[in-house]
UniProtKB/Swiss-Prot annotation:
GO terms for molecular function: ATP binding; ATP phosphoribosyltransferase activity; magnesium ion binding. Its EC number is 2.4.2.17. Feedback inhibited by histidine. Its main location: cytoplasm. Catalyzes the condensation of ATP and 5-phosphoribose 1-diphosphate to form N'-(5'-phosphoribosyl)-ATP (PR-ATP). Has a crucial role in the pathway because the rate of histidine biosynthesis seems to be controlled primarily by regulation of HisG enzymatic activity. Pathway: Amino-acid biosynthesis; L-histidine biosynthesis; L-histidine from 5-phospho-alpha-D-ribose 1-diphosphate: step 1/9. The gene is hisG. Belongs to the ATP phosphoribosyltransferase family. Long subfamily. This is ATP phosphoribosyltransferase. PROSITE patterns: ATP_P_PHORIBOSYLTR (PS01316). PANTHER family: ATP PHOSPHORIBOSYLTRANSFERASE, ATP PHOSPHORIBOSYLTRANSFERASE ATP-PRTASE. The keyword Transport does not apply.
């Protein structure tokens, strides 16, 4: 049975369960279960600390895992990056008091940096050629500056609200742009049918979130221009209507372009423009 690790708590937990659920798997826990089996598809979902998932996968204890890219890199685990999952986007940044003029390029051996991501920070400092002091904390690093423990923090920033409320601001460019990822031990893991099916299903959900289907009726004389606006994946579907000189067109378009596409189609005298969400797809 294929074992897939999902985060048991934290910002990535809900997104991971929702994604697997939408992909057709039974993965929802009743209470605080440590694992859930889906015998129909030969999969067991194991709920682990997000920080530990890449390590379990790298040792072959778990076949696949959903965790953060930041946590994967910080663990130092040797895993294969299978897919970006499209949720949990954040930046891993340095932050300092808003009144500070300190920048990463000005770090010295006396600069104290509090973080829960020792490996990521040490790697960045090494690339900068700086031997600053890294202070390892297990969460809630924002308060460390106020308590006089650190001069700077390095942490994951999503909205920025938490560091703003702590009187801090990010400094320098992000060390890493992170999001949820699917990881495997090695390429051989993905040769398993159950692993391939899971990855393909999840990929279908991710793509479906990025695209919609647009349908419209159009004077046939404007079809060449319409094809440029809605080219589809391979080609738009074009069908004749029971009205001379008119056709029905159907195509996938990027979700973020919906309103601009509708504006352009309206200028071509398109009628009955309908946009439909896609639940899942295979490209």
């Amino acid at each position: 049975m294929l074992q897939i690790a999902l985060p048991n708590k934290g910002a990535l937990a809900d997104g991971a369960v929702t994604l697997a659920d939408e992909a057709g798997y039974n993965c929802r826990r009743r209470g605080r279960e440590l694992s859930v089996r889906d015998p129909d598809y030969g999969v067991e979902f194991v709920f682990l600390r997000p920080r530990d998932i890449a390590t379990y996968v790298s040792k072959g204890i778990i076949d696949l895992g959903v965790t953060g890219l930041d946590l994967t890199y910080d663990s130092g685990a040797d895993v294969t990056h299978v897919l970006d999952l499209g949720f949990g986007a954040a930046r891993f940044c340095y932050a300092a008091p808003k009144s500070s003029d300190l920048t990463p390029d000005a770090f010295t051996a006396d600069t104290r940096i509090a973080t829960s991501y020792d490996t990521l920070v040490r790697r960045d400092l090494e690339q900068r050629g700086v031997d600053a002091r890294v202070i390892s904390l297990d969460g809630a690093v924002e308060i460390s500056i106020q308590l006089g423990v650190a001069d700077v923090i390095a942490d994951v920033v999503q909205t920025g609200r938490t560091i703003d409320e702590a009187g801090l601001a990010t400094i320098g460019a992000p060390i890493l742009n992170t999001e949820a990822v699917l990881v495997a031990q090695n390429g051989h893991t993905m040769e398993k049918d159950a692993a391939q099916h899971f990855a393909e299903r999840v990929k279908g959900i991710i793509v479906a979130r990025e695209y919609v289907v647009v349908e419209y009726d159009l004077p046939e004389e404007h079809l060449p221009e319409a094809r440029k606006i809605t080219p589809g994946i391979e080609s738009p579907t074009v069908s004749p209507l029971n009205k001379d000189g008119w056709v029905a067109v159907k195509a996938m378009i990027e979700r973020e372009s919906v309103n601009a596409v509708m504006d352009d189609l309206t200028e071509l005298d398109a009628r009955g423009i309908i946009v439909t969400d896609i639940r899942t797809c295979r490209m």
